[in-house]
Amino acid sequence: MEPNKDDNVSLAATAQISAPPVLQDASSLPGFSAIPPVVPPSFPPPMAPIPMMPHPPVARPPTFRPPVSQNGGVKTSDSDSESDDEHIEISEESKQVRERQEKALQDLLVKRRAAAMAVPTNDKAVRDRLRRLGEPITLFGEQEMERRARLTQLLTRYDINGQLDKLVKDHEEDVTPKEEVDDEVLEYPFFTEGPKELREARIEIAKFSVKRAAVRIQRAKRRRDDPDEDMDAETKWALKHAKHMALDCSNFGDDRPLTGCSFSRDGKILATCSLSGVTKLWEMPQVTNTIAVLKDHKERATDVVFSPVDDCLATASADRTAKLWKTDGTLLQTFEGHLDRLARVAFHPSGKYLGTTSYDKTWRLWDINTGAELLLQEGHSRSVYGIAFQQDGALAASCGLDSLARVWDLRTGRSILVFQGHIKPVFSVNFSPNGYHLASGGEDNQCRIWDLRMRKSLYIIPAHANLVSQVKYEPQEGYFLATASYDMKVNIWSGRDFSLVKSLAGHESKVASLDITADSSCIATVSHDRTIKLWTSSGNDDEDEEKETMDIDL
């Protein structure tokens, strides 16, 4: 490629400018002497600038447009379409990997949203938020942190579904100062308006309890002031009587494990129930002949109890009902209303009301004459299992799987005492005849004695090697206390110092229930080994031993 003429001209001009000037000899000039010439230092000649060459033009690649068909679509050859199908097709393994990646990404996004979600830490606020969202406030076995985690998942789900308006509204209600007022309101007890029959029942219970309490106090004062009354001697005699209790008879009660037993008020009939749903009435004292067989429950029977004033009896079942019977097998009433299976049943001392406990976290009070539900009592956070009435009739005690025992005033409907001490579910409670002691037994293998006057635990009995299924005071004066356990034993404890008096062993499986006759002469126990056992004391032998001891002393 030849250079341009303009480029040659510029190179020549540059060369002329860059050449050094020619120095004349100073001696040839007038007025100057001959001076040796000064030789300038040698410098390398400057390099000429490199000429800028223009860039060659860049040729753009030709654009190709696919032919367009008449209907507007792009024409493709069969070979091209087949090659495209080969590149687009994905294997099943790749699809599974992609699905796993998408799921992992979705889970990560959900976790990020959940972590960024504003969720209250106050348990009351969490419950209130769940109530407003229409969700269950508390699930079975749920703790505070689990409840908050469930609320977080619900709010995250609503956020993903795009229900932001509801979330923003709830959040505004939570951050407003009104939340503090709502929390203060929740601290106060809430009341549910009951029917007119409940008010009448409370008045009747109050009148009944005042009379019974007056009689009990007068009797206690008389025994204290009367010199002929020797309470210590009576206590020793009762404990000695209990110490010599032994197995009197045993019989199979059903084809399935037995769950409950109860004596009639005169001690002539023993009722037992079993997992087969059948309740049987046995003739005492040998329990070999059945008087009646009650077969109306559709599920397993969980408890049976006789009325304290007549020959009626009540049964509880897992079919969510309780039934009232006569001793001849006639069904009188069916009590329906519980939302889950029943656990225990108990008569009020007046014989007019029936209390039932259920796994729906409530216990209820029924009118046995009309079959109407008078009271639905909440208060336990988990299933309610045991129930008992004070002999005066003023108080009721309940226990449950929340490890608490609560005492209720039936005259006002208030929870007056909450006994905390068991570390596992409580299955049985029973009032002492003195009116101010309460015994409770539970899964922690302990039997605790509570004092209603001192409002605290009076004594802790390490009763058994397995859970305590039932506790029962001697019905006359509370001289001793009997406990049944899943360790296949029934233990008798002193009602004064709670020392072990006697251990009744003979069952081959879990002891489910026990009962004591009104005169304390016999103890009945039923077990999962399907047997009924009666324990009695040989009083004549004790009297003979005392006579022999007196003769020796003389």
Curated annotation (Swiss-Prot):
Principal subcellular localization: nucleus
Compositionally biased residues, Basic and acidic residues: 88-99
Region (Disordered): 48-99
One Gene Ontology cellular component annotation held by this UniProt entry: nuclear speck
The keyword Nucleus is assigned to this record: yes
Subcellular localization: Nucleus speckle
WD repeat ranges per the UniProt record: 253-292, 296-335, 337-376, 379-418, 421-460, 463-503, 506-545
InterPro entries given in the database record: G-protein_beta_WD-40_rep, PRP4-like, PRP4-like_sf, WD40/YVTN_repeat-like_dom_sf, WD40_repeat_CS, WD40_repeat_dom_sf, WD40_rpt
Keywords assigned: mRNA processing, mRNA splicing, Nucleus, Repeat, Spliceosome, WD repeat
Disruption phenotype: Gametophytic lethality due to female gametophyte defect, when homozygous.
Pro residues composition-biased segments: 48-65
GO BP: cell fate determination; cell-cell signaling; embryo sac development; embryo sac egg cell differentiation; mRNA splicing, via spliceosome
Keyword Nucleus: yes
PANTHER family listed in its UniProt record: PRE-MRNA PROCESSING FACTOR 4, WD40 REPEAT PROTEIN
Role this protein plays: Participates in pre-mRNA splicing. Part of the U4/U5/U6 tri-snRNP complex, one of the building blocks of the spliceosome. Essential for reproduction. In female gametophyte, is necessary for the egg cell and central cell fate determination and hence reproductive success. Involved in a mechanism that prevents accessory cells from adopting gametic cell fate. Modulates egg cell signaling center that regulates the development of all female gametophytic cells.
Official protein name in the record: U4/U6 small nuclear ribonucleoprotein PRP4-like protein
Gene giving rise to this polypeptide: LIS
